[in-house]
Swiss-Prot record:
Protein name, as recorded: Small ribosomal subunit protein uS13
Record keywords: Ribonucleoprotein, Ribosomal protein, RNA-binding, rRNA-binding, tRNA-binding
Region Disordered, annotated ranges: 93-118
Family stated for the protein in its record: Belongs to the universal ribosomal protein uS13 family.
Amino acid sequence: MARIAGVNIPDNKHTVISLTYIYGVGRTTAQKICAETGVNPAAKIKDLSDEQIEQLRGEVAKFTTEGDLRREINMKIKRLMDLGCYRGLRHRRGLPVRGQRTKTNARTRKGPRKPIRK
């Protein structure tokens, strides 16, 4: 298994699919990385040379991925909560942030139902 950005990339999958195992790299970004490095997106990782894998590592390093991206997202959410703005309050209360209805639905964000006490 090749290791790129601290993630073990599966050998038996196509390059584009394998790159999506990295947090912060989706299909579009993976295709851009393959185009920049000149690596065939349909080639499997096990068929790539060490030089090509190094090129992929260098190209992935240009993007914010894995722990840095998670930290950045958490810091942005924390900033909203500290500001006390509407979005921050919704994050703090564990409710949907983007204007979805909550009278019904929103169970994923709100958690399991709580029984009504009498």
